[in-house]
């Protein structure tokens, strides 16, 4: 199912207007890691994510906002699910909480693991800007709700559970 098809199905089932804006993207730009993170979302383990603020600045993209919808994509381009941001905050890297790290659902869910993998993930953004990684650099922390878990429910043979953000 494409992002457009999933958005149509979600809107039709939930009563959300199809004119409501949404974005479609893959975690980490896709690949095996992106697919793994999408599966964590579908399993209900991952309810948050983080990006370096610098990445938004480099790409000249607007910051996410509470209430915005996204269709999460797999590396294949197949839509995995619909999420909606419920909280967006800017926090320095060295002040990200263990609670947020746990919500991200990755690895052992510890803050130490989160810092290790996100330092590795954010470093290329700093390098692209000609800067060294900054422990005090701002992170865009997002919390989200999974609204349309089509792949997870399809595998179970159930209908997707629906809600509105």
Protein language model annotation of sequence segments:
Residues 1-82, 91-165:
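Mixed-charge, low-complexity intrinsically disordered regions
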